[in-house]
């Protein structure tokens, strides 16, 4: 039903009624300081509305699956975006991994949702008939203290490969 409606209020309601998890760990409360057991996974969202030049999410998912550190890639609950689950090795550096991923994806001209920097971010269940799963994905090791992607020179961004955009 969520993927069938264009009514934004109805979409929000339907999405909020879906089962959900916190990908990055088990929490006693949904607060960063309430982490009980980390999973050493980060989930990033790539929304279609933020990336209008991506016209085919299925083809785009296949491109994301080529990244050696992507463990899982699937369609978002709306079907208009994608998400990736990526392993890392130090939960204390969650935001630093996110910053590096945000920069790396920006260089590929892909905007990832900045709210994914939150270690207790909720991930709503979504169905994907053709998810990508790689149990042998590489552990992501890059970190970055701060991300200042808004100030990247356009030459830096647009000199990167445009073949990511489908």
Please provide the spans of the model-predicted regions.
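Signature for HUH/AEP ssDNA processing cores
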Residues: 1-80, 87-100, 157-161
């Amino acid at each position: 039903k969520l993927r069938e409606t264009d009514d934004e209020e109805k979409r929000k309601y339907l999405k909020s009624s879906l089962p959900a998890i916190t990908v990055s760990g088990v929490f006693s409360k949904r607060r960063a300081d309430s982490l009980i057991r980390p999973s050493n996974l980060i989930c990033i969202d790539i929304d279609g509305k933020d990336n209008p030049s991506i016209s085919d999410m299925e083809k785009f998912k296949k491109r994301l699956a080529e990244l050696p550190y992507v463990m899982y890639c699937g369609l978002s609950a709306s079907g208009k975006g994608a998400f990736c689950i990526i392993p890392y090795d130090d939960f204390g550096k969650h935001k630093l991994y996110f910053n590096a991923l945000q920069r790396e994806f920006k260089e590929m001209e892909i905007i990832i949702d900045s709210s994914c920097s939150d270690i207790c971010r909720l991930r709503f269940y979504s169905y994907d008939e053709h998810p990508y799963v790689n149990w042998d994905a590489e552990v992501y090791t890059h970190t970055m203290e701060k991300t200042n992607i808004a100030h990247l020179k356009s030459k830096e961004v647009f000199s990167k490969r445009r073949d990511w955009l489908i």
